[in-house]
């Protein structure tokens, strides 16, 4: 590629769910979060998704998922006011660019009044690498920019490009039971975006086929490796009453509809489709990517991810509990999340520990994880 693609270089989250302060966390082309259940891995992922939702949909819509800001705010950080100013905001700080030095710095503080009757974006600022910035004032004035609307929603120029990056992030929490069912086809034009649950995978594949037949054929050929007994796998359309898209697998002398396919097959197909898309999202975030997958399929997906990030076409963030998957990665691609003595999530880079770096010469990351060495080093 002639031009290096922008990526999410760092993130810091405060007062969101389990997180009091994540501190600034550097992200690479591939970053994999590991840790015990309840450690706080998902809180960081959900914070990124919530930030995207505020930028795209506004604060009210973003908080509907949590049934109100009071439920998603860290429980130990109640909204208070001092001298007429709100304290303990929920805060997001991100750096997006081709490198940390050449990044646009995004800052957003979200808060509510003490009675939880109103919520608002208390402060927001986007600072370009050249120093030029746009800002939403701390003081809230009636008739000013809508209290729940991000300044990135209508940003132009360099800030507009960063806003496009945020809008294009792809979060996946695949639900195979929904992915196999027929869904209404998108007929208004424009690019088809894969739903978070993967439910519109058939329509997504039809769009890929339209954009780049070679990319589509490559996905089908790769699926033949996953399903060696299958002759073909195609998205189909039905228009008996409503035009709907669905998947159909050709096997021997009969055809199998998408809702009869295995959960692993559907998950692999969706992940391949996102990674092989002719215009992939700048950031792909997948929680517990190993769910429903056999070791061979996990190995295939890790190779696909490695190819994509090395080519610079996308950036990938994963969470996993699979030691086998970890054995396929490098130590510097991992972030361990563990609770400290106060019960607060802390984010550790195992590769920063000299002792672990030595152990990694003899043991793969998955082995170090199951041995407890990663958690010991984080204490």
Regions found by a protein language model. Give the residues of each.
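C-terminal lobe/lid and adjacent interdomain/linker elements of RecA-like ASCE P-loop ATPase modules
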Residues: 1-6, 300-379
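Hydrophobic anchor at the beta1->P-loop junction of P-loop NTPases
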Residues: 33
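P-loop (Walker A) phosphate-binding loop of NTP-binding proteins
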Residues: 36
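Conserved lysine of the Walker
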Residues: 41
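Conserved P-loop NTP-binding catalytic core
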Residues: 46-113
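Electropositive, glycine-dotted interaction segments
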Residues: 91-93, 97-221, 225
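Conserved ABC ATPase signature
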Residues: 221-276, 283-296
């Amino acid at each position: 590629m002639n031009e290096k693609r922008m990526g999410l270089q760092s993130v810091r989250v405060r007062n969101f769910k389990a997180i009091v302060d994540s501190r600034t966390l550097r992200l690479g082309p591939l970053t994999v979060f590991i840790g015990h259940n309840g450690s706080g891995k998902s809180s960081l992922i959900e914070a990124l998704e919530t930030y995207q939702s505020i930028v795209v949909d506004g604060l009210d819509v973003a908080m509907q998922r949590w049934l109100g800001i009071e439920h998603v705010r860290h429980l130990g950080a109640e909204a208070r006011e001092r001298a007429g100013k709100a304290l303990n905001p929920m805060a997001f700080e991100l750096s997006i660019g081709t490198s940390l030095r050449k990044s646009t710095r995004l800052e957003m503080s979200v808060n509510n009044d003490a009675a939880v009757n109103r919520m608002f974006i208390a402060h927001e600022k986007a600072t370009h690498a050249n120093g030029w910035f746009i800002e939403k004032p701390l003081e809230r004035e009636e008739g000013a920019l809508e209290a729940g609307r991000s300044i990135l929603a209508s940003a132009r120029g360099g800030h507009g490009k960063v806003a496009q990056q945020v809008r294009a992030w792809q979060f996946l929490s695949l639900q195979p039971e929904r992915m196999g069912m027929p869904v209404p086809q998108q007929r208004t034009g424009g690019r088809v975006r894969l739903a978070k649950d993967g439910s519109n995978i058939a329509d997504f594949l039809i769009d890929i086929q339209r954009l780049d037949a070679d990319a589509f054929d490559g996905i089908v050929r790769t699926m033949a490796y996953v399903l060696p007994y299958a002759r073909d796998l195609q998205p189909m359309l039905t228009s008996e009453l409503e035009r709907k898209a669905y998947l159909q697998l050709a096997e021997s002398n009969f055809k199998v509809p998408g809702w009869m396919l295995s959960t692993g097959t559907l998950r692999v197909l969706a992940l391949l489709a996102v990674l092989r898309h002719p215009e992939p999202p700048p950031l792909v975030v997948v929680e517990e990517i190993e769910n429903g997958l056999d070791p061979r399929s996990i190995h295939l997906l890790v190779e696909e991810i490695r190819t994509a990030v090395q080519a610079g076409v996308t950036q990938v963030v994963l969470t996993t509990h699979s030691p086998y998957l970890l054995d396929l990665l490098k130590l510097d691609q991992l972030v361990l999340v563990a609770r400290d003595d106060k019960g607060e999530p802390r984010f550790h880079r195992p590769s920063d520990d000299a002792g672990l770096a030595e152990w990694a010469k003899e043991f793969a990351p998955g082995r170090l994880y199951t041995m407890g060495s990663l958690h010991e080093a984080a204490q």
